[in-house]
Amino acid sequence: MAAIVERAPSLEFPILTGVSAGAINIAHLAAYRGSLAAAVDALRREWGRLTADRVYRISPMRLARTGLRWLGAMAFRRHGGPGMVRGLMDMEPLRRFLARSLDLRGIDENIAAGRLRAVAISATPYASDQTVTFVQGAEDVPTWRRALRYSLRTHLTLDHVMASAAIPILFPAVRVNDQFYGDGSVRQTAPFAPAIHLGARALVLISSRPDPETPRVPRASVRAQRERQYPSLAEVMGMLLHTAFLDAPEADAERLERINRLLEACPAGSGAPDGLKPIHLLVLRPSQDLGSLVAAQRVRLPPLVRWVVRGMGGEREAAAGFLSYLLFDPAYTTALIDLGYADAHREWSRIERFLRVTGGT
């Protein structure tokens, strides 16, 4: 984003949607009082300040207490009450950090000024089998209800942001009104849908999954493959988290491109079925496997987290995916930002063509 707004300083995104860590990003962009270019610059600085102790808190006592509660729940079939397990880590440091850096009152101001049409944050209610998208926008912004997903108009608060970023098991659920919510990626089968419902006709997907041709950190080392080592818990957790967070956007992108091709094939004047319209899509991918960046920064995990991760088999090469969900360090985030910046400049001709076709520049 920094490279894009540097070359297209007047660019604005009137519709912003996000889940998980993306909810933090779009909340910042939607609430910032100023241009998109200034908002992106400020967001870049905030990520540069983020450290593990500003995201989560974990201690030997908390780990021991959590383990005892799990054992007690299994032994005595206690599944509720004040002593129940609420996550391995405490997210209160992240709440305090965001409370100081986010002023969500700016969303209403940007909507009133016409810089923003709508912002949407999705979260997963644990008492339901549906994904809920919380929407704040102009008065004529629609709501929707579809199979397994629906929207609610609201004024977004820090609770909505925290709920969308609460990775199950690792972090406690967050209460919003009368329900407890977790990470919005968990059940989101159509991540592009909120933006399309809100009227978007052009989408930008910034993926953390590299091109299939890009060399990657191996799923298992050569030695592990030779010895046929059983996959470690960290490898399994990494696979599950990647499935929840990365697979759905990729599948939705393929589905959208297929629909666009079908619409192009419709005879002129015949009208598109179901009122469908083509949606322009730009997918930006990193030029290298992010797992290689994780491996270089593994030592920067907090000592207790590093000890736990080692016990889960996190020292294996293929566990880098799991570690990326725990690694918050300026050196790592700066490396990610620098990679994205360089990649966007490298891809600028494609980005510029997309902006020109969609009226973004």
Regions found by a protein language model. Give the residues of each.
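Acidic, Ser/Thr-rich peripheral helices and adjacent loops at domain boundaries
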Residues: 217-261, 304-307
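C-terminal helical/tail subdomains of lipid-metabolizing enzymes
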Residues: 85, 98, 261-361
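Active-site gating loop/helix substructures
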Residues: 112-240, 318-327
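Patatin-like phospholipase
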Residues: 1-86, 92, 98, 137-150, ...
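Glycine-rich, charged/polar anion/phosphate-binding loops
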Residues: 105-106, 187-192, 259-271
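Extended hydrophobic secondary-structure segments that form protein cores and membrane-embedded regions
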Residues: 15-20, 118-123, 281-285
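Short secondary-structure boundary segments
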Residues: 28, 207, 286-288
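Active-site periphery "cap/insert" segments of enzyme catalytic domains
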Residues: 85-123, 132
